[in-house]
Amino acid sequence: MPLSQTAVASVLTCGPGNDFYTTFGHSAIRICDTAQGIDLVYNYGTFDFDTPHFYWKFMRGQLDYMLGRSSFNGFMEEYIYYGRAVWEQRLHLSPQEVNNLYLMLEWNYQPENRYYHYDFFRDNCATRIRDMVRLSLGHTDTLIADYEGPVRTYRRWVTHELEGTLEWWRLGIDLLFGLPADHRCTDVESMFLPIVMHDIYAGTYPKGTDGPIVDESVQLLPEKRAPLSRSFPPVVVFALVFVAVALLTWKRKMPCWADRTLFILAGLLGLALLFMWFGTDHYCTEWNLNILWASPLLILIAIRLERSPKWALWLQEGCFAVAAVWVVWCGLSMALLPLILTLVLRVGVLLKN
């Protein structure tokens, strides 16, 4: 059934929550046609917890997400309960374009069409909405962004949201992300984050027109959630570890078991990163240069210590150097540097001995 001439389409942007999976906010599309009593929200961020082997598929990047549909009031209840902010951007679309968007969403909501293979950077709850809005205008290159915000890589967009309060989560993300995360994003690519899509839409207009695509922007809900407390910075923790190891090294009191523990833990981390690269479908964890310093080679060095071949020790020291340059060049968490320096120091002692 086609919509009336007064139907409107909006992009809903939801602010972050206090759980990690809500840190980056959320996006949805609202279709409101008061003449026909329609007020629906389409949400590409849902998944089925009853999926067999749910957590295993989630870890391996093989969990299908799906399009959900709910009433507008039902959608808002969750955000009222958790005290999360919600903004609405009413789109400047013709009645035909609103109807096109509605029909595409309804087709996409059919059971055989609603599932999709989630990708954190390239295919998520925000990018799906971005692409559906573009398609409703006729084809995919009808939007021009006049956005004057910063040009960032995928990694920097993500870690920017975590700085100051979720530094340990930022460190974890910098450990997991590989070279694909260091791609410099275009305006369109930057819209993978809901709040960034909100900001870019504010300065976006359809090709061939002078007016913006957003007719009106209102805040439906204020933020009422409790602010996150600042965590103890990981860079301080690992700097203290480095200082302690340096003092023990200077006094020649570093026990063998401590070296073995240090090297084995780093090597096991490297094996985990290799699994995330080769054993999963996650695009963002491929070509992870953290494997250069968290190297499985360190497990072999841990077994042999002073009896390790010189070539292996020199190779590992070279890998440390390359990894350190990558950490600085790409703006990874500075907490990684004291970790790398600790390993450099202890492998250097083995070389000297």
Model-inferred region functions:
Residues 26, 39, 88-90, 126:
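Extracellular structured ligand-interaction cores
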Residues 74-78, 90, 136:
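A general structural signal for short secondary-structure boundary/capping elements
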Residues 5-83:
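Glycine-rich catalytic cores of cysteine/serine-nucleophile enzymes that process amide/ester linkages
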